[in-house]
Amino acid sequence: MAQGSRAPSGPPLPVLPVDDWLNFRVDLFGDEHRRLLLEMLTQGCSNFVGLLNFGVPSPVYALEALVDFQVRNAFMKVKPVAQEIIRICILANHYRNSRDVLRDLRTQLDVLYSDPLKTRLLRGLIRLCRAAQTGVKPEDISVHLGADDVTFGVLKRALVRLHRVRDALGLRASPEAEARYPRLTTYNLLFHPPPFTTVEAVDLCAENLSDVTQRRNRPLRCLTSIKRPGSRTLEDALNDMYLLLTLRHLQLRHALELQMMQDWVVERCNRLCDALYFCYTQAPETRQTFVTLVRGLELARQHSSPAFQPMLYNLLQLLTQLHEANVYLCPGYLHFSAYKLLKKIQSVSDARERGEFGDEDEEQENDGEPREAQLDLEADPTAREGELFFFSKNLYGNGEVFRVPEQPSRYLRRRMFVERPETLQIFYNFHEGKITTETYHLQRIYSMMIEGASRQTGLTPKRFMELLDRAPLGQESEPEITEHRDLFADVFRRPVTDAASSSSASSSSSSASPNSVSLPSARSSSTRTTTPASTYTSAGTSSTTGLLLSSSLSGSHGISSADLEQPPRQRRRMVSVTLFSPYSVAYSHHRRHRRRRSPPPAPRGPAHTRFQGPDSMPSTSYGSDVEDPRDDLAENLRHL
């Protein structure tokens, strides 16, 4: 590419440190929960999460759009809830780090605008206003230089006055300075950059913001503080006024954004409780942790500055218990399935009260199915109590969605169950120019749980409830799940791979002749080298341990790289400096330099023609000289 037609280089990207814990704070998360967060996140997104955790000042809405990550396959069953909890953890961690940035900014601004530098700044402002002679008083500007409440309206009014002074003096921003404006939002997306007129002023402001965001403990600087008295110009005084006014407004805006982010983190937890309630019904052993979480949220809403550590601890503790329950968390789908089943039961009950099912011939609905089919009743002939009927569409009867916990009397008795009277299914309609809603109360969630538990234990719901009441007294034993593993194939059995068979064969040959030396075969030499588990998983992860254990049980002495979780292929994530969309420009800038992908290879294997293929027998309806269209298709495939 020629030098003249070369695309202009983009603004420098920020360099932010990411530690081994992805910048998760130790005062918010314990070591156990930090390890859990690292195990749930893939390797491909770890650096990006560390960048978000660093606390670069950003608007809340921009940060919500930027938070992105992937969850490992080992946590697939809890993924719907894990994604929301991880997002809350990232927002809370970002809030605490960004709050430290604001504290440093306030301290250094007060140090900057103090004597003796304050006196020199005011003298420069007086000389600036006198030289312009526009009627702008120095007091109109200086009153905001030490204030903590410089709103956006106050900032605009002060900038209008400074622009009048600038125009009267004939000062304009140089093209070199305008080209460096994007640097001003590299380390702070909340900063409203003023029109600095010199390159030196732009670079100095960018360095100040970089030092504050990265918490380097360097004092803020201005042109008046770094230049000698004889070398200061009116343009330097103008740029210093720009710097102080915009930093004072940044201080206020940052504080307001942190207040909104603090309340938003609590609100996200509050909204998550709707899904966590159905997760609790799927794993009743999480009752105590769920109740503690809700009580903590109630206290957090009553304080102006809630502590995030207890709330985050309960969230991650609940997620750990849900992961150990080994059920598929699907709160939204479970909510809808409960509504469908309860509505069907209610409609059949209402029809029975109206006497619509009096005769056998009348037990047909509009679609021609009998009432039993409409109720979705299913017989269980393998139950110990004889022939039982259960609702086939009750998800609580599925062991992969709801599993009866150990000692069910501790969690499934009526007085131990956490009721939620206002469980609503809401439908939205549009009527006469307005959005209207229809609500349906789900009042039998506990009955559905008992019905599903009785199906898994092979008991009637009445008998199951009796055992729950008598088991704590020692009169009856706890109900247990009826296993039917011998009726079905074991799909979780680990297959014996080629590496396992070759290793077992070599071990048997070596044991038969201890003095003999076996050479590797051609098949084993062409196989791919096994990649160690530490390449893809963190130390001490349960997935690696599970792979090692399962391979040892199946007789395999090596782990195939296909069994290990690899980081997904992702686009390169880079920080841009465009205001409110900081991670999009870099990709579009480098997009043109990508190499074009090669076309896909031609399909392998024999093509279907009239001479070969599944229907190569000659047809009697056509003559032998009739062309078959498959011949042309095969010829075209050969020339691809």
Swiss-Prot record:
Residues 631-640 have a biased composition (Basic and acidic residues). Belongs to the herpesviridae pp85 family. Residues 358-367 have a biased composition (Acidic residues). InterPro entries: Herpes_pp85. Residues 500-562 have a biased composition (Low complexity). GO terms for biological process: DNA-templated viral transcription; symbiont-mediated suppression of host cytoplasmic pattern recognition receptor signaling pathway via inhibition of TBK1 activity; symbiont-mediated suppression of host toll-like receptor signaling pathway. Residues 353-373, 500-571, 586-640 are annotated as: Disordered. GO terms for cellular component: host cell cytoplasm; host cell nucleus; viral tegument. Keywords: Host cytoplasm, Host nucleus, Host-virus interaction, Inhibition of host innate immune response by virus, Inhibition of host TBK1 by virus, Inhibition of host TLR pathway by virus, Viral immunoevasion, Virion, Virion tegument. The keyword Oxidoreductase does not apply. The gene is UL35. It holds the Pfam family Herpes_pp85. Residues 588-598 have a biased composition (Basic residues). The lineage of its organism: Viruses, Duplodnaviria, Heunggongvirae, Peploviricota, Herviviricetes. The keyword Metal-binding does not apply. Coiled coil: none annotated. This is Protein UL35.
